[in-house]
Amino acid sequence: TTLVLYRMGDFYELFFDDAEKAARLLDITLTARGQSAGKPIAMAGVPFHAVDTYLAKLIKLGESVAICEQVGEVGASKGPVERKVMRVVTPGTLTDAELLNERADALLVAVVSQSVRGGVAKSTDQTPCALAWLGMASGTLGLTECTQRDLAGWLARLQPAEVIYDRERIPPALGPFLAQPRGTAFTPRPTWQFDAGLGQRKLCEQLKVSHLQAYGAESMSLGHAAAAALLSYAEHTQGRALAHVSS
């Protein structure tokens, strides 16, 4: 789940279960205001000028955070001030130097396996897999296809901050990583986002080319599927096109 921070004046506030979770993880005060369904509304907040410090703590713990900013003017109309989610910060989509800490870049990796649907896939060591990765700060983009046997090795080399995967086709090699994440966030995504045709189009648009032959990726259909989910997720979290990604 994603924690939601609402900008309210000089603070970013969280409510209900988000407030309780944030209070526990960040060691901040949990309060209450008003009522909903006869129960007090849990509330916790952090000063807006220190939000990056708290974001860094949450990201280090593997959490994802949506930043909801005020877009309407206070007092311009009756009722609540209009707010809008401006960006979503996840472990693999960091671009702010303050949040990256010791990492030069935080890699976001998408993994897909050519296998049957329904939970953890029944496959062999030779089952085709693909990885697509993106360094959000550096703007570097990579793509490879491999076998199930080599998937764990690729993840060990890349050391991603976040891995997204098809929730209906989970590569067995991901099992040990999911059981013991060890500093990597794992985010399931719906199967329809791993669309090879969409991925090929997105790659061409992103790289400003008409085909992928120069990159040796024209026929990597499984890689295109991973790229589709990767680029869609990155664009969603940033709330904009990835103009800095060009290689």
Language model features with spans:
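Charged catalytic and DNA/RNA-contacting regions of genome-maintenance
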Residues: 1-247
